[in-house]
Amino acid sequence: GEKIVEYVETGQIEALEAEREALPVDMAALTRVEGIGPKTAKKLYDALGIEDLDDLEAAAEAEEIQSVSGFGEKTEQNILDNLPFAREAGQRSLLGAARPIGEEIRGFLGAVDHVEEAALAGSLRRWRPTIGDVDVLVATERPRSVTETLTDWDRVESVVESGPTKSTLRVAGMQVDVRQVDPAEFGSALVYFTGSKAHNIVLRNRAIDRSRKVNEYGVFEVTDAERADPDTRAGDRVAGETEEGVYEALDLPYIPPELREDRGEVAAADAGTLPDLLEEGDMRGDLHTHTTWSDGEATIEEMIEGAAAFGHDYLVISDHAAGPGVVADTGLTDDQLRDQLGAIEDAAADAEIEVLTSVEANVAPDGSIGDTDRDLLAELDLVVASPHADLRDGSDRTDRLVAAVEDPLVDVLGHPSGRLLNERPAMEFDPGALGAAAAKHGVALEVNANPHRLDLWGAAVAAAIDEGATIAIDTDAHDPSKFSYLRYGVHTARRGWATKADVLNARDVDGLWAFLE
Protein backbone atom coordinates (compact mmCIF):
# COMPACT_ATOMS: atom_id res chain seq x y z
CA GLY A 1 0.00 0.00 0.00
CA GLU A 2 2.77 2.46 0.92
CA LYS A 3 4.48 2.06 -2.45
CA ILE A 4 1.22 2.80 -4.31
CA VAL A 5 0.76 6.00 -2.27
CA GLU A 6 4.39 6.93 -2.97
CA TYR A 7 3.87 6.36 -6.71
CA VAL A 8 0.64 8.40 -6.82
CA GLU A 9 2.22 11.28 -4.87
CA THR A 10 5.68 11.38 -6.51
CA GLY A 11 5.30 9.51 -9.81
CA GLN A 12 8.01 7.03 -8.84
CA ILE A 13 8.96 4.40 -6.27
CA GLU A 14 12.31 5.11 -4.65
CA ALA A 15 13.19 1.44 -4.08
CA LEU A 16 12.51 0.66 -7.75
CA GLU A 17 14.58 3.65 -8.94
CA ALA A 18 17.46 2.48 -6.73
CA GLU A 19 17.22 -1.00 -8.30
CA ARG A 20 17.27 0.57 -11.77
CA GLU A 21 20.38 2.61 -10.96
CA ALA A 22 22.09 -0.49 -9.58
CA LEU A 23 21.22 -2.40 -12.77
CA PRO A 24 21.26 0.17 -15.61
CA VAL A 25 20.39 -2.28 -18.39
CA ASP A 26 17.87 -2.02 -21.24
CA MET A 27 15.92 -5.01 -19.93
CA ALA A 28 13.15 -4.74 -22.56
CA ALA A 29 15.67 -5.00 -25.42
CA LEU A 30 17.92 -7.67 -23.90
CA THR A 31 15.05 -10.00 -23.00
CA ARG A 32 13.83 -9.90 -26.62
CA VAL A 33 16.92 -11.97 -27.46
CA GLU A 34 16.02 -15.65 -27.38
CA GLY A 35 17.52 -17.34 -24.32
CA ILE A 36 17.97 -14.16 -22.25
CA GLY A 37 15.61 -13.53 -19.35
CA PRO A 38 15.91 -10.95 -16.54
CA LYS A 39 18.21 -13.22 -14.46
CA THR A 40 20.50 -13.94 -17.42
CA ALA A 41 20.62 -10.24 -18.29
CA LYS A 42 21.72 -9.43 -14.72
CA LYS A 43 24.36 -12.17 -14.87
CA LEU A 44 25.78 -10.72 -18.12
CA TYR A 45 25.78 -7.21 -16.64
CA ASP A 46 27.58 -8.38 -13.49
CA ALA A 47 30.17 -10.39 -15.46
CA LEU A 48 30.75 -8.22 -18.53
CA GLY A 49 28.95 -4.90 -17.93
CA ILE A 50 26.48 -5.58 -20.76
CA GLU A 51 23.78 -2.87 -20.73
CA ASP A 52 22.20 -3.01 -24.19
CA LEU A 53 22.09 -4.85 -27.53
CA ASP A 54 25.27 -3.16 -28.83
CA ASP A 55 27.22 -4.32 -25.75
CA LEU A 56 25.75 -7.80 -26.16
CA GLU A 57 26.74 -8.00 -29.83
CA ALA A 58 30.29 -6.78 -29.15
CA ALA A 59 30.74 -9.31 -26.32
CA ALA A 60 29.37 -12.19 -28.42
CA GLU A 61 31.59 -11.31 -31.40
CA ALA A 62 34.62 -11.11 -29.09
CA GLU A 63 33.64 -14.59 -27.77
CA GLU A 64 33.47 -13.22 -24.21
CA ILE A 65 29.99 -14.57 -23.41
CA GLN A 66 31.08 -18.22 -23.56
CA SER A 67 33.48 -17.48 -20.69
CA VAL A 68 30.57 -16.64 -18.33
CA SER A 69 29.47 -19.66 -16.29
CA GLY A 70 26.28 -21.21 -17.64
CA PHE A 71 26.96 -19.94 -21.18
CA GLY A 72 28.67 -21.91 -23.92
CA GLU A 73 29.69 -21.53 -27.53
CA LYS A 74 26.26 -22.63 -28.75
CA THR A 75 24.44 -20.06 -26.58
CA GLU A 76 26.78 -17.34 -27.79
CA GLN A 77 26.08 -18.22 -31.44
CA ASN A 78 22.35 -18.36 -30.67
CA ILE A 79 22.56 -14.81 -29.27
CA LEU A 80 24.28 -13.57 -32.45
CA ASP A 81 21.68 -15.32 -34.62
CA ASN A 82 18.82 -13.71 -32.69
CA LEU A 83 20.14 -10.15 -32.45
CA PRO A 84 18.61 -8.98 -35.78
CA PHE A 85 15.16 -10.14 -34.59
CA ALA A 86 15.59 -8.32 -31.25
CA ARG A 87 16.68 -5.10 -32.98
CA GLU A 88 13.87 -5.08 -35.53
CA ALA A 89 11.28 -5.94 -32.88
CA GLY A 90 12.29 -2.86 -30.91
CA GLN A 91 11.60 -0.59 -33.87
CA ARG A 92 8.23 -1.95 -34.99
CA SER A 93 4.76 -1.62 -33.48
CA LEU A 94 2.07 -4.27 -33.57
CA LEU A 95 -0.66 -3.88 -36.17
CA GLY A 96 -3.22 -4.00 -33.35
CA ALA A 97 -1.64 -0.96 -31.65
CA ALA A 98 -0.97 1.04 -34.82
CA ARG A 99 -4.19 0.48 -36.76
CA PRO A 100 -6.57 2.17 -34.26
CA ILE A 101 -4.22 5.19 -34.08
CA GLY A 102 -4.10 5.39 -37.88
CA GLU A 103 -7.88 5.14 -38.11
CA GLU A 104 -8.33 7.86 -35.51
CA ILE A 105 -6.01 10.21 -37.44
CA ARG A 106 -7.71 9.36 -40.74
CA GLY A 107 -11.09 10.11 -39.14
CA PHE A 108 -9.88 13.43 -37.74
CA LEU A 109 -8.36 14.54 -41.07
CA GLY A 110 -11.39 13.36 -43.05
CA ALA A 111 -13.54 15.85 -41.13
CA VAL A 112 -11.15 18.81 -41.58
CA ASP A 113 -12.19 21.67 -43.91
CA HIS A 114 -10.63 21.53 -47.39
CA VAL A 115 -9.78 17.81 -47.07
CA GLU A 116 -11.38 15.93 -49.96
CA GLU A 117 -10.16 12.50 -48.91
CA ALA A 118 -7.92 10.91 -46.26
CA ALA A 119 -6.53 7.37 -46.40
CA LEU A 120 -4.06 5.14 -44.61
CA ALA A 121 -1.02 4.08 -46.63
CA GLY A 122 2.15 2.05 -46.15
CA SER A 123 2.40 -1.31 -44.41
CA LEU A 124 -0.52 -0.34 -42.16
CA ARG A 125 -2.86 -0.29 -45.17
CA ARG A 126 -1.43 -3.63 -46.32
CA TRP A 127 -2.22 -4.99 -42.81
CA ARG A 128 1.32 -6.19 -42.16
CA PRO A 129 1.68 -7.78 -38.70
CA THR A 130 4.14 -5.12 -37.53
CA ILE A 131 4.42 -1.48 -38.56
CA GLY A 132 7.34 0.96 -38.71
CA ASP A 133 5.37 4.20 -38.63
CA VAL A 134 1.84 5.28 -39.49
CA ASP A 135 1.42 6.70 -43.02
CA VAL A 136 -1.60 8.86 -43.86
CA LEU A 137 -2.37 10.50 -47.20
CA VAL A 138 -4.62 13.53 -47.64
CA ALA A 139 -6.14 15.00 -50.83
CA THR A 140 -6.43 18.78 -50.52
CA GLU A 141 -6.00 22.00 -52.49
CA ARG A 142 -5.28 23.94 -49.26
CA PRO A 143 -2.34 22.07 -47.67
CA ARG A 144 -1.17 24.93 -45.40
CA SER A 145 -4.58 25.25 -43.80
CA VAL A 146 -4.72 21.50 -43.21
CA THR A 147 -1.20 21.46 -41.71
CA GLU A 148 -2.18 24.18 -39.22
CA THR A 149 -5.30 22.30 -38.14
CA LEU A 150 -3.37 19.03 -37.82
CA THR A 151 -0.47 20.40 -35.77
CA ASP A 152 -2.95 22.07 -33.37
CA TRP A 153 -4.82 18.79 -32.74
CA ASP A 154 -4.80 17.93 -29.03
CA ARG A 155 -3.80 14.30 -29.73
CA VAL A 156 -0.44 15.43 -31.17
CA GLU A 157 2.31 14.95 -28.56
CA SER A 158 5.03 16.62 -30.60
CA VAL A 159 5.66 17.95 -34.09
CA VAL A 160 8.89 16.51 -35.51
CA GLU A 161 8.60 18.52 -38.73
CA SER A 162 5.82 20.28 -40.57
CA GLY A 163 5.64 21.66 -44.08
CA PRO A 164 3.07 22.26 -46.80
CA THR A 165 3.30 18.72 -48.23
CA LYS A 166 4.50 16.55 -45.35
CA SER A 167 4.25 16.62 -41.56
CA THR A 168 5.83 14.17 -39.12
CA LEU A 169 4.20 13.96 -35.70
CA ARG A 170 4.15 11.83 -32.56
CA VAL A 171 0.68 10.58 -31.64
CA ALA A 172 0.15 8.05 -28.82
CA GLY A 173 3.88 7.34 -28.83
CA MET A 174 3.97 6.50 -32.55
CA GLN A 175 5.57 8.36 -35.43
CA VAL A 176 2.96 9.50 -37.95
CA ASP A 177 3.81 10.78 -41.45
CA VAL A 178 1.01 12.79 -43.06
CA ARG A 179 1.46 13.61 -46.76
CA GLN A 180 -0.76 16.13 -48.55
CA VAL A 181 -1.26 15.85 -52.28
CA ASP A 182 -3.28 17.49 -55.02
CA PRO A 183 -6.63 15.68 -55.49
CA ALA A 184 -5.74 15.00 -59.15
CA GLU A 185 -2.74 12.97 -57.92
CA PHE A 186 -4.33 11.30 -54.89
CA GLY A 187 -4.84 7.86 -56.51
CA SER A 188 -1.31 7.56 -57.88
CA ALA A 189 0.17 8.84 -54.60
CA LEU A 190 -1.91 6.27 -52.71
CA VAL A 191 -0.65 3.41 -54.90
CA TYR A 192 2.93 4.68 -54.51
CA PHE A 193 2.87 5.22 -50.73
CA THR A 194 0.90 2.03 -50.00
CA GLY A 195 3.64 -0.05 -51.63
CA SER A 196 5.13 -2.49 -51.33
CA LYS A 197 8.26 -1.24 -53.09
CA ALA A 198 8.50 -4.57 -54.92
CA HIS A 199 4.88 -4.27 -56.15
CA ASN A 200 5.56 -0.73 -57.38
CA ILE A 201 8.62 -1.87 -59.36
CA VAL A 202 6.45 -4.44 -61.19
CA LEU A 203 3.95 -1.66 -62.02
CA ARG A 204 6.77 0.63 -63.25
CA ASN A 205 8.10 -2.05 -65.59
CA ARG A 206 4.59 -2.73 -66.86
CA ALA A 207 4.17 0.97 -67.63
CA ILE A 208 7.45 1.03 -69.59
CA ASP A 209 6.18 -1.86 -71.76
CA ARG A 210 3.20 0.36 -72.66
CA SER A 211 5.20 3.54 -73.49
CA ARG A 212 3.98 5.00 -70.22
CA LYS A 213 5.48 5.84 -66.86
CA VAL A 214 3.90 5.59 -63.42
CA ASN A 215 5.00 7.44 -60.29
CA GLU A 216 3.42 9.14 -57.29
CA TYR A 217 2.13 11.96 -59.55
CA GLY A 218 0.20 9.84 -62.05
CA VAL A 219 0.38 7.62 -65.11
CA PHE A 220 1.80 9.46 -68.13
CA GLU A 221 2.01 8.74 -71.87
CA VAL A 222 5.66 9.54 -72.62
CA THR A 223 8.11 9.78 -75.49
CA ASP A 224 11.65 8.54 -74.84
CA ALA A 225 12.74 12.15 -74.31
CA GLU A 226 9.96 12.74 -71.78
CA ARG A 227 10.82 9.51 -69.94
CA ALA A 228 14.38 10.79 -69.48
CA ASP A 229 13.14 14.26 -68.42
CA PRO A 230 14.01 14.93 -64.76
CA ASP A 231 10.59 16.64 -64.44
CA THR A 232 8.61 13.80 -62.88
CA ARG A 233 5.37 15.18 -64.36
CA ALA A 234 6.67 15.30 -67.94
CA GLY A 235 4.35 13.67 -70.49
CA ASP A 236 0.60 13.46 -70.96
CA ARG A 237 -1.15 12.45 -67.73
CA VAL A 238 -3.75 9.71 -68.37
CA ALA A 239 -4.55 8.71 -64.75
CA GLY A 240 -3.83 9.70 -61.17
CA GLU A 241 -7.03 10.78 -59.43
CA THR A 242 -8.07 7.27 -58.30
CA GLU A 243 -6.24 4.01 -57.67
CA GLU A 244 -8.69 2.20 -59.96
CA GLY A 245 -7.74 4.64 -62.73
CA VAL A 246 -4.02 4.01 -62.19
CA TYR A 247 -4.44 0.23 -62.48
CA GLU A 248 -6.77 0.62 -65.46
CA ALA A 249 -4.17 2.76 -67.26
CA LEU A 250 -1.83 -0.24 -66.87
CA ASP A 251 -4.52 -2.62 -68.25
CA LEU A 252 -5.18 -4.14 -64.81
CA PRO A 253 -8.16 -4.49 -62.49
CA TYR A 254 -7.86 -2.97 -59.01
CA ILE A 255 -5.55 -4.98 -56.73
CA PRO A 256 -6.49 -4.99 -53.01
CA PRO A 257 -3.75 -3.53 -50.76
CA GLU A 258 -3.23 -6.79 -48.82
CA LEU A 259 -2.05 -8.50 -52.02
CA ARG A 260 0.51 -5.86 -53.04
CA GLU A 261 3.63 -7.77 -51.99
CA ASP A 262 4.95 -8.94 -55.41
CA ARG A 263 3.82 -12.52 -54.85
CA GLY A 264 2.32 -12.91 -58.31
CA GLU A 265 -0.62 -10.54 -57.82
CA VAL A 266 0.10 -8.47 -60.96
CA ALA A 267 0.32 -11.59 -63.15
CA ALA A 268 -2.92 -12.89 -61.58
CA ALA A 269 -4.63 -9.53 -62.15
CA ASP A 270 -3.41 -9.55 -65.76
CA ALA A 271 -4.81 -13.07 -66.26
CA GLY A 272 -8.09 -12.22 -64.54
CA THR A 273 -7.49 -14.79 -61.79
CA LEU A 274 -7.27 -12.59 -58.68
CA PRO A 275 -9.21 -14.28 -55.86
CA ASP A 276 -12.51 -12.90 -54.57
CA LEU A 277 -11.07 -12.22 -51.12
CA LEU A 278 -12.75 -13.02 -47.81
CA GLU A 279 -14.60 -10.05 -46.23
CA GLU A 280 -15.00 -9.22 -42.52
CA GLY A 281 -18.76 -9.63 -42.93
CA ASP A 282 -18.36 -13.24 -44.09
CA MET A 283 -17.39 -14.51 -40.63
CA ARG A 284 -20.02 -16.49 -38.71
CA GLY A 285 -18.38 -17.70 -35.49
CA ASP A 286 -15.26 -18.15 -33.35
CA LEU A 287 -13.68 -21.57 -32.75
CA HIS A 288 -11.08 -20.70 -30.08
CA THR A 289 -12.07 -18.78 -26.92
CA HIS A 290 -11.40 -18.95 -23.18
CA THR A 291 -13.39 -18.39 -19.98
CA THR A 292 -12.70 -18.08 -16.26
CA TRP A 293 -12.57 -21.89 -16.18
CA SER A 294 -8.96 -21.53 -17.43
CA ASP A 295 -7.11 -18.23 -17.94
CA GLY A 296 -10.00 -16.22 -19.40
CA GLU A 297 -11.51 -13.17 -17.73
CA ALA A 298 -15.21 -13.73 -18.46
CA THR A 299 -17.71 -16.46 -17.59
CA ILE A 300 -19.15 -18.91 -20.10
CA GLU A 301 -22.41 -16.92 -20.10
CA GLU A 302 -20.60 -13.60 -20.65
CA MET A 303 -18.65 -15.03 -23.58
CA ILE A 304 -21.85 -16.40 -25.17
CA GLU A 305 -23.64 -13.06 -24.74
CA GLY A 306 -20.60 -11.23 -26.13
CA ALA A 307 -20.42 -13.48 -29.19
CA ALA A 308 -24.15 -13.01 -29.86
CA ALA A 309 -23.81 -9.22 -29.49
CA PHE A 310 -20.84 -9.29 -31.89
CA GLY A 311 -23.09 -10.93 -34.48
CA HIS A 312 -21.80 -14.50 -34.38
CA ASP A 313 -24.06 -17.49 -35.10
CA TYR A 314 -21.94 -19.88 -33.04
CA LEU A 315 -19.20 -19.98 -30.42
CA VAL A 316 -16.72 -22.65 -29.39
CA ILE A 317 -15.54 -22.64 -25.75
CA SER A 318 -12.00 -24.07 -25.76
CA ASP A 319 -10.37 -23.57 -22.38
CA HIS A 320 -6.81 -24.76 -21.78
CA ALA A 321 -6.07 -28.34 -20.87
CA ALA A 322 -3.42 -28.60 -18.16
CA GLY A 323 0.08 -29.18 -19.51
CA PRO A 324 3.57 -27.75 -20.14
CA GLY A 325 3.62 -24.14 -21.35
CA VAL A 326 0.15 -23.40 -19.93
CA VAL A 327 0.11 -20.91 -17.04
CA ALA A 328 0.35 -22.88 -13.79
CA ASP A 329 -2.98 -23.95 -12.27
CA THR A 330 -5.06 -22.53 -15.14
CA GLY A 331 -5.31 -25.62 -17.36
CA LEU A 332 -8.21 -28.03 -16.83
CA THR A 333 -7.78 -31.55 -15.47
CA ASP A 334 -10.03 -34.28 -16.91
CA ASP A 335 -12.42 -33.97 -13.97
CA GLN A 336 -12.62 -30.19 -14.34
CA LEU A 337 -13.24 -30.52 -18.08
CA ARG A 338 -16.09 -32.99 -17.43
CA ASP A 339 -17.61 -30.51 -14.95
CA GLN A 340 -17.25 -27.71 -17.49
CA LEU A 341 -19.12 -29.68 -20.16
CA GLY A 342 -22.15 -29.69 -17.87
CA ALA A 343 -21.80 -25.94 -17.29
CA ILE A 344 -21.54 -25.27 -21.04
CA GLU A 345 -24.61 -27.44 -21.69
CA ASP A 346 -26.61 -25.45 -19.10
CA ALA A 347 -25.51 -22.10 -20.57
CA ALA A 348 -26.15 -23.29 -24.14
CA ALA A 349 -29.75 -24.20 -23.29
CA ASP A 350 -30.59 -20.50 -22.82
CA ALA A 351 -28.34 -19.16 -25.60
CA GLU A 352 -29.58 -17.52 -28.79
CA ILE A 353 -26.56 -18.86 -30.68
CA GLU A 354 -25.11 -22.36 -31.06
CA VAL A 355 -22.47 -23.19 -28.43
CA LEU A 356 -19.96 -25.99 -29.00
CA THR A 357 -17.76 -27.78 -26.47
CA SER A 358 -14.01 -27.99 -26.93
CA VAL A 359 -10.67 -27.82 -25.18
CA GLU A 360 -7.33 -26.33 -26.22
CA ALA A 361 -5.13 -29.40 -25.94
CA ASN A 362 -1.35 -29.17 -25.95
CA VAL A 363 0.81 -30.37 -28.84
CA ALA A 364 3.78 -32.14 -27.21
CA PRO A 365 7.28 -31.94 -28.75
CA ASP A 366 6.66 -35.29 -30.51
CA GLY A 367 3.33 -34.04 -31.90
CA SER A 368 1.15 -36.12 -29.59
CA ILE A 369 -1.82 -34.43 -27.94
CA GLY A 370 -1.23 -33.75 -24.26
CA ASP A 371 -2.42 -35.79 -21.34
CA THR A 372 -6.20 -35.31 -21.61
CA ASP A 373 -8.14 -38.60 -21.60
CA ARG A 374 -8.82 -39.58 -25.22
CA ASP A 375 -12.34 -40.85 -24.52
CA LEU A 376 -13.10 -37.43 -23.04
CA LEU A 377 -11.62 -35.67 -26.10
CA ALA A 378 -13.85 -37.84 -28.30
CA GLU A 379 -16.94 -36.56 -26.44
CA LEU A 380 -16.19 -32.93 -27.34
CA ASP A 381 -17.76 -31.24 -30.36
CA LEU A 382 -14.34 -30.04 -31.51
CA VAL A 383 -10.70 -30.23 -30.38
CA VAL A 384 -8.24 -27.36 -30.81
CA ALA A 385 -4.60 -28.45 -30.40
CA SER A 386 -1.84 -25.86 -30.02
CA PRO A 387 1.91 -25.89 -29.29
CA HIS A 388 2.67 -24.10 -25.99
CA ALA A 389 6.07 -25.48 -24.92
CA ASP A 390 9.44 -26.28 -26.55
CA LEU A 391 9.01 -23.50 -29.10
CA ARG A 392 12.57 -22.20 -29.24
CA ASP A 393 14.91 -24.97 -30.36
CA GLY A 394 15.45 -23.46 -33.82
CA SER A 395 15.21 -26.74 -35.76
CA ASP A 396 12.54 -27.56 -38.36
CA ARG A 397 9.41 -28.76 -36.54
CA THR A 398 7.21 -29.67 -39.50
CA ASP A 399 7.14 -33.27 -38.23
CA ARG A 400 5.74 -32.14 -34.85
CA LEU A 401 2.87 -30.18 -36.41
CA VAL A 402 2.10 -32.82 -39.07
CA ALA A 403 1.90 -35.47 -36.32
CA ALA A 404 -0.64 -33.29 -34.50
CA VAL A 405 -2.92 -32.91 -37.54
CA GLU A 406 -2.68 -36.66 -38.20
CA ASP A 407 -4.35 -37.32 -34.83
CA PRO A 408 -7.96 -38.27 -35.67
CA LEU A 409 -9.29 -36.36 -32.63
CA VAL A 410 -7.83 -32.98 -33.69
CA ASP A 411 -10.09 -30.57 -35.62
CA VAL A 412 -8.18 -27.26 -35.49
CA LEU A 413 -4.42 -26.66 -35.14
CA GLY A 414 -4.10 -23.47 -33.05
CA HIS A 415 -1.40 -20.80 -33.55
CA PRO A 416 0.84 -23.33 -35.35
CA SER A 417 4.20 -21.54 -35.08
CA GLY A 418 3.79 -20.39 -31.47
CA ARG A 419 5.28 -17.00 -32.37
CA LEU A 420 4.71 -13.88 -30.28
CA LEU A 421 5.39 -10.82 -32.43
CA ASN A 422 8.38 -8.75 -31.21
CA GLU A 423 8.88 -11.31 -28.40
CA ARG A 424 9.40 -14.84 -29.72
CA PRO A 425 10.20 -15.91 -33.29
CA ALA A 426 8.08 -18.50 -35.08
CA MET A 427 8.90 -22.18 -34.82
CA GLU A 428 10.47 -23.34 -38.10
CA PHE A 429 8.15 -25.42 -40.28
CA ASP A 430 7.08 -25.90 -43.90
CA PRO A 431 3.58 -24.38 -44.30
CA GLY A 432 2.99 -26.17 -47.61
CA ALA A 433 3.74 -29.60 -46.13
CA LEU A 434 1.59 -28.79 -43.10
CA GLY A 435 -1.21 -27.58 -45.40
CA ALA A 436 -1.12 -30.81 -47.40
CA ALA A 437 -1.33 -32.92 -44.22
CA ALA A 438 -4.14 -30.77 -42.82
CA ALA A 439 -6.11 -31.08 -46.08
CA LYS A 440 -5.64 -34.86 -46.11
CA HIS A 441 -6.79 -35.30 -42.51
CA GLY A 442 -9.60 -32.74 -42.48
CA VAL A 443 -8.00 -30.40 -39.94
CA ALA A 444 -8.34 -26.60 -40.13
CA LEU A 445 -5.20 -24.49 -39.65
CA GLU A 446 -5.70 -21.45 -37.47
CA VAL A 447 -5.01 -17.83 -38.20
CA ASN A 448 -4.90 -16.67 -34.59
CA ALA A 449 -6.19 -13.10 -34.80
CA ASN A 450 -4.67 -11.90 -31.54
CA PRO A 451 -2.42 -8.99 -32.66
CA HIS A 452 0.45 -10.45 -30.59
CA ARG A 453 0.31 -13.62 -32.71
CA LEU A 454 -1.24 -13.32 -36.22
CA ASP A 455 -0.22 -16.95 -36.63
CA LEU A 456 -0.48 -18.27 -39.36
CA TRP A 457 0.62 -15.20 -41.34
CA GLY A 458 -0.12 -14.25 -44.96
CA ALA A 459 2.56 -16.18 -46.85
CA ALA A 460 1.96 -19.29 -44.72
CA VAL A 461 -1.80 -19.06 -45.34
CA ALA A 462 -1.17 -18.87 -49.10
CA ALA A 463 1.15 -21.91 -49.01
CA ALA A 464 -1.39 -23.94 -46.97
CA ILE A 465 -4.36 -22.97 -49.16
CA ASP A 466 -2.39 -23.91 -52.28
CA GLU A 467 -2.24 -27.44 -50.84
CA GLY A 468 -6.01 -27.52 -50.26
CA ALA A 469 -6.03 -26.69 -46.54
CA THR A 470 -8.99 -25.08 -44.77
CA ILE A 471 -8.29 -22.06 -42.54
CA ALA A 472 -9.98 -21.14 -39.24
CA ILE A 473 -9.78 -17.50 -38.13
CA ASP A 474 -10.07 -17.31 -34.35
CA THR A 475 -9.58 -14.54 -31.81
CA ASP A 476 -8.40 -16.70 -28.88
CA ALA A 477 -10.57 -14.21 -26.93
CA HIS A 478 -10.16 -14.21 -23.15
CA ASP A 479 -13.01 -11.70 -22.72
CA PRO A 480 -15.81 -10.43 -25.01
CA SER A 481 -14.01 -7.21 -26.00
CA LYS A 482 -11.42 -9.34 -27.84
CA PHE A 483 -13.96 -10.61 -30.40
CA SER A 484 -13.09 -7.39 -32.23
CA TYR A 485 -9.62 -8.85 -32.95
CA LEU A 486 -11.34 -10.89 -35.67
CA ARG A 487 -10.65 -8.22 -38.30
CA TYR A 488 -6.89 -8.59 -37.85
CA GLY A 489 -7.25 -12.28 -38.61
CA VAL A 490 -9.48 -11.66 -41.62
CA HIS A 491 -7.02 -9.22 -43.20
CA THR A 492 -4.10 -11.53 -42.39
CA ALA A 493 -5.95 -14.31 -44.25
CA ARG A 494 -6.59 -11.87 -47.14
CA ARG A 495 -2.80 -11.33 -47.28
CA GLY A 496 -2.71 -15.09 -47.93
CA TRP A 497 -5.22 -14.79 -50.81
CA ALA A 498 -7.98 -16.48 -48.76
CA THR A 499 -11.55 -16.55 -50.09
CA LYS A 500 -14.73 -17.20 -48.12
CA ALA A 501 -14.66 -20.83 -49.32
CA ASP A 502 -11.22 -21.34 -47.71
CA VAL A 503 -12.38 -20.40 -44.20
CA LEU A 504 -14.15 -22.87 -41.92
CA ASN A 505 -15.87 -20.32 -39.69
CA ALA A 506 -17.14 -18.31 -42.63
CA ARG A 507 -19.54 -21.27 -43.06
CA ASP A 508 -22.93 -21.43 -41.36
CA VAL A 509 -23.60 -23.81 -38.46
CA ASP A 510 -24.56 -26.67 -40.80
CA GLY A 511 -21.38 -26.15 -42.81
CA LEU A 512 -19.31 -26.22 -39.62
CA TRP A 513 -20.94 -29.47 -38.43
CA ALA A 514 -20.44 -31.03 -41.88
CA PHE A 515 -16.69 -30.30 -41.63
CA LEU A 516 -16.47 -31.67 -38.08
CA GLU A 517 -18.28 -34.89 -38.99
PLM segments and residue spans:
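Conserved hydrophobic/aromatic pocket- or pore-lining residues that grip, position, or stack substrates
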Residues: 56, 122, 288, 319, ...
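Charged catalytic cores and adjacent phosphate/nucleic-acid-binding surfaces used
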Residues: 127-201, 205-209, 214-283, 300-311, ...
